[in-house]
Amino acid sequence: MKILVDENIPYAHKIFSRLGDVQIIHGRKITAQIVSSYDALIVRSVTNVNQSLLEGSKVRFVGSTTSGIDHIDDHWLEKSGIKFSYAAGCNAIAVVEYVFTALLLLSQRYGFHLRDKTVGIIGVGNIGRLLYQRLNAFGVPTLLCDPPQAEISTIGEWQLLEKLVTEADVLTLHTPLTYHGRHATWHLINEDLLSALPSTKRILINTCRGAVVDNVALLHALKKGKLLSVILDVWEKEPNLSLSLLNNVDIGTAHIAGYSLEGKVRGAIKIFNDYSKFLGAIQSLNVSAFLPAPMIEYVRWHGVINEEELRKLAYLIYDLQFDDILLRRNIHKPHGFDQLRTNYCERREWSSLSVGTDNNISTNMLNQLGFKSILI
């Protein structure tokens, strides 16, 4: 089997070479001519997989190591008899910890307490649901908005978007990008909705897809003095994002919210397992076999873990401000945005840190937040 794999998938050769001959390539450089002779294609979100890319090729299996599939024409793949697999939820932990770290950063910067703010979660799939659980574990009030989920789920009280934006202090977006239908999300956050935000300061976080927010309308609102702190990990027209918008947001990063090492390996192994099943050569790999020891493995903490202590623990693992600085320094360089993603550090998840505490309440809370905590 010949397998073409995006170079941003960690351990790609080590993982997929068990199933065939592997060729590594930049995801944006995959063309119909290049892919035509391969049996399988393994991609991330920067590669649009559709009829124009694959028609007439030998490809019989497509895997995306991402949780979203708006870059995949899965209907055409099914019609063409091409097996498709993706890694739903593989990066949920990473995105949730990015958002939590962002909130801890802003609470420090602007002098508020998270438990005094209400977080509106827009989109309650794998990521939104996990964020809801972790915020609740820390005692942060939440509101939920997801019309499709509201019809089938009972995890909480559901709000209409128009009501949520007037009541929540924080709006964090976790929807897929869809252009059609009753619940289309393209430009979900638009000029009208931004105008409807209360005059008191609000926070907007987008880690799903850039076009869920109308970037032009957002920039216009910020330039007009809208009291809005903005954290953007995703942008319209990536990698050619609006420099004016970047200059007006609190934190900007290069579409790396889901880029934990655990999340990327989790996604790759999900596709590996599915492809091996497709080939009838059943093999199974575990994430832990590919993870190196973290830089900091264990800390001891005395007493109750409050917001300041949680912030210190989160900062031990991930420095969000550094990613913001890197984007601002490199965005003017040729291919700067993509280079940041290609050469991204081995960011770890909170579960990589063991925390010994002498307080049972702290131990339980830290475990609910994703750390490994033991009572000592």
UniProtKB/Swiss-Prot annotation:
Assigned GO CC terms: cytosol
EC number: 1.1.1.290
Record: active site: R209, E238, H255
Residues at which NAD(+) binds: D146, T175, D233, G258
Single GO molecular function: hydroxypyruvate reductase [NAD(P)H] activity
Domain of life (superkingdom): Bacteria
Family stated for the protein in its record: Belongs to the D-isomer specific 2-hydroxyacid dehydrogenase family. PdxB subfamily.
Function, in words: Catalyzes the oxidation of erythronate-4-phosphate to 3-hydroxy-2-oxo-4-phosphonooxybutanoate.
Subunit structure comment from the entry: Homodimer.
Name under which the protein is recorded: Erythronate-4-phosphate dehydrogenase
Source organism (scientific name): Baumannia cicadellinicola subsp. Homalodisca coagulata
Gene from which the chain derives: pdxB
